[in-house]
Amino acid sequence: MLDNTGYEEITLSSLSSSDYSHLEELVNFLIEHCKNKKVNISLPSLRIDAFSLDVMQKVQDIKKSSLTFAPEAGSQRLRDVINKGLTEEVILKGATEAFEGGWNRVKLYFMLGLPTETEEDIKGIAELSNKIAAAYYETVPKEKRNGKVQIVASTSFFIPKPFTPFQWAAQCTKEQFIEKAYTTRRAISEQLNQKSIKYNWHEADASVMEGILARGDRKIAQVILKAYQKGCIFDAWGAVSYTHLR
């Protein structure tokens, strides 16, 4: 496929790539195949406490893409609420090992609108991102740095799903989602390393629609049919407003 398409990156996509029992074997195979092609090997959705330094060291000699970690929440309190099982110490250790392995680009995934979330939890996203950026400058000697560190903090919005522990939790409104995103952005702009942090968030309209589809009953079938009749098929519709489809 690489030879026929010209793709320059292979992504090992999973809810937790590091939990795949044959990860090391797969990475060894990909390294052998890609080492002369300068093809990126991307390892997203890594569970930081299970992140393999050995695997990271093996792929560092190939053209690097960014590493992706998913702290999910900015504070320890909220990570405990959602049973994430990660401490700030473990998160910073995982990031430090990545920096020592030669990476200077890290993506962080968080979620806004989680049950019991407070403004302090939201600001914690900015604070944790700043600490990770600071860890780069504290870990990597100036003469060994490959440019500035790049931290991309991305937030999606919490959508309660059936048959999950939070299935009865309330979902935020579009306006509440947007305000939380603005709060996060303002908090990041106040951080010491804010120039090293890029922030983006998921579209609020899409999250509201997903929540409706996730918990709707049989009556939602008529809505889906109507949307199809108005031209919606498998398009992401990211370039247009969702409101005109109502």
Residue spans for each PLM region:
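Conserved SAM/AdoMet-binding glycine-rich loop
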Residues: 1-148
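A generic structural signal for alpha->beta connector loops
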Residues: 38-40, 150, 194-198
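A structural signal for short, well-ordered beta-strand segments
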Residues: 108, 153-155
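Class I SAM-binding transferase module
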Residues: 130, 137, 152, 182-186
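Short Gly/Ser/Thr- and Asp/Glu-enriched loop/turn motifs at secondary-structure junctions
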Residues: 146-150, 203-204
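Conserved small/polar residues in nucleotide/adenosyl-binding loops
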Residues: 243-244
